[in-house]
Amino acid sequence: MKKVALISLCIFTALSAFADSPNTATASINLEQEKQNWELAQHQDYLKRLKQREVFLQVEGLLKSAVKKQQFSEATQNITKTLIDSLQGYPLQYDLLARFWETKIAFLQNDDIQGRQQAINELNALVQQNYPFVTPAFQALLQKLSTLNEQQTSATSDNAKENNRVQKEQNQVENPKQLAEIVRKSDPNTLDKTVLIDAFPRYLKTLPEQMNNLSFESYQKWANTWQLSEDEIKQWKIAFLNRFFDNENTDFQKWRDEQIRQLQTDNLTERRLRMAIWQKTELTSWLNLLSAESKSKQEWRYWEAKQDILKNTKKLTALSKERGFYPMLAATQLKQAYQLNVPIAPSFTQAEQLPFKQVFAMITELRELGRNGLAKQRWRILLDNVDFTTQLKLSEYAKNQQWFELAVDASIVAKAWDYLSLRLPNAYSEYFNAALQNLNISKTFAMAIARQESAWNPMAQSSANARGLMQLLPSTAKLTAENNQLPYQGEQDLFKPLNNILLGTAHLNELNGKYPNNRILIAAAYNAGANRVGKWLSRASGKLALDEFVASIPFYETRGYVQNVVAYDFYYQILQNKENPQIFSQEELNRLY
């Protein structure tokens, strides 16, 4: 509607200028008529699109029914083909045509040579039209037709044996608890050692982390028996150390540190560094073990700067000029303002936009139909075939269309990390304004959480069944709704932006009651749960500064989550022109964790 209003305004402005011309005395008489004609044309286009959408859905339903009932008569084929042909100008006409041919080919008999040839001819003609995104589907159908008459031979006895062997190995991998028995009973000459290698890390997870008399010696014997290479044994040791890293046995801890020094594997060294940070022991020897690549990370440059008293200010100053959480920490350590350069994203001219008109119409219609996943697939194909500047312009276009998740996606594909207005669009602003009334949560923080959780995809769903913009679990949503007298009718409500934002911000406010004005703890609890945060605080025993606590969060995901949310909050303050933008609150900085 915003676009329609803008176009209308432009037309009326142009017509008004025309009416003011002394050489067009009759133009003012026709202005109202021109306005009515334009509005009528817009309305007729809208009605036409609604009708086409209805036909699209009806034909799609017919094709689904044909497949389900295994009936696709010639009469039904003719009806559906006629209806598809009537959809001239509809963005998804060729999608439906591909679906029609997919259904028709499924019903072709092997001996129907004439029908197969007719299909090949028509599909070849469609391929020649080179219709965006749909042509590969037609090509795939042609390939399917070319192999339709090929008879599938039964598997040979050798293949059957191979399949049985693979299935047996898969069963072994799926039951890692049995690995010790498999090693004891199996002959190294008959069982592929990759089965053993792949299953070992999962076998370790079946063992208690704090088991007594912990030793790698027995697994070294396995490795010798199965003639594992040095690199394979190294991978086993890494898996073993990762599994039992926090085992409290002092002999194991001594062996662990020796192995970390020998293996010099960054993920283990970084984990040992985090342990040293929360234990408040020396860091330099562990920092020196890092590879050049890891040493270049902002996080370890920050900690190296804190250890180097002589060059502390110089290193922190250099870091503070970059973008990110640790540059913000560096500026805070230096008690300096954090300066941020935000480039302006380019936009399409009308002429530049024309080549994408068909694609934009397709994506618009898919989104209208709720096919956001397919719309994103086509958006990604588009992004992968244009240059960096065009990717930026596409991101800006998507943002202006309120395709917020596609704008973010384009910024990620382009690696446009400095273009914060594209990475962090001002999405669902009115909903946040409404939801945050009378809550002790800032708009920029709530939006930072949503951006980190879903990248502004309202249909996002995690493997744990967290849903929507702020990725709420149905159980959390239900409890939050009850505690705050908010409407909630079930899981599907979480895919509705307003409902999700109401519940997500209410949950943030509940966490704020537990951790007043401390986004570090609120964000960590929102991601990992308040119980885990409680355990981490208990382990820290009120001895850690803000930077030490964040660095020692044991979960990789939560650690990155907290850092991103704090950074996004500050970026949103800049983008929303907040006065005196604040990186950290006094409560966050002054607290010992």
From Swiss-Prot:
Ranges of biased composition (kind: Basic and acidic residues): 159-168
GO molecular function: hydrolase activity, hydrolyzing O-glycosyl compounds; peptidoglycan lytic transglycosylase activity
Pfam families: SLT, SLT_L
Top-level taxon: Bacteria
Intracellular or extracellular location(s): Periplasm
Signal peptide, first to last residue: 1-19
One GO term of the biological process aspect: cell wall organization
Gene Ontology CC terms, in alphabetical order: membrane; periplasmic space
Reactions mediated catalytically: Exolytic cleavage of the (1->4)-beta-glycosidic linkage between N-acetylmuramic acid (MurNAc) and N-acetylglucosamine (GlcNAc) residues in peptidoglycan, from either the reducing or the non-reducing ends of the peptidoglycan chains, with concomitant formation of a 1,6-anhydrobond in the MurNAc residue
Recorded family membership: Belongs to the transglycosylase Slt family.
Summary of the function given for this chain in its UniProt record: Murein-degrading enzyme. May play a role in recycling of muropeptides during cell elongation and/or cell division.
Protein name: Putative soluble lytic murein transglycosylase
Source organism: Haemophilus influenzae (strain ATCC 51907 / DSM 11121 / KW20 / Rd)
